[in-house]
Amino acid sequence: MDAKQSVAAAKPSLAKKTASASFRLRNGSLNAVRLRRVFDLFDRNGDGEITVDELAQALDALGLVADRDGLAATVSAYVPEGAAGLRFEDFDALHRALGDALFGSLDGAAAAGEPGGGGGDEEEEMREAFKVFDVDGDGFISASELQEVLKKLGLPEAGSLATVREMICNVDRNSDGRVDFGEFKSMMQGITVWGP
């Protein structure tokens, strides 16, 4: 196994994962706002379309490995004829289809009395998300690690270490200047939106 393959093997993968239902937003209008922000971040050149290359780059920046051919096949089903990539409406349709496939439909989950349908080990999903931010693997997210991830995502908050430190302070319950897994988990559970 060469170095590139070993790095890819160490990264979380999108293949054959069941996602945690707790990460699915249930409030339609809030979901649309967040989805638009994600779309704009992924649309690196600002042309109003997300190409397979842009999507692959965004997933790679998040530390996720996606099979390029599988990604292209999935995305192409939602790209309108004559378009180079996904427009926001297409991205929204893809997001809804993936959400239904991973979590079950919102109607079906509500009818079954489950808060998201589908299973998945929520703790393991949280740990995988934590690892994206814990760049050095020491079990903590420092301000510099958070800043590094925000830069990779192209977020403006990455420009100021003071802003990033403030973000850390908002989550850091024991005031050690870092975010441990317990603090990260509490923060992630706190931002989950369960709509009607």
Curated annotation (Swiss-Prot):
Pfam families: EF-hand_6, EF-hand_7. CDD domains: EFh (cd00051). Keywords: Calcium, Metal-binding, Repeat. The keyword Flavoprotein does not apply. Ca(2+) 2 binds at residues 134, 136, 138, 145. Residues 30-65, 121-156, 159-194 form the EF-hand domain. Ca(2+) 1 binds at residues 43, 45, 47, 49, 54. Ca(2+) 3 binds at residues 172, 174, 176, 178, 183. Transmembrane segments: none annotated. It comes from the Eukaryota. Potential calcium sensor. PANTHER family: EF-HAND CALCIUM-BINDING DOMAIN CONTAINING PROTEIN. This is Probable calcium-binding protein CML32. The lineage of its organism: Eukaryota, Viridiplantae, Streptophyta, Embryophyta, Tracheophyta.
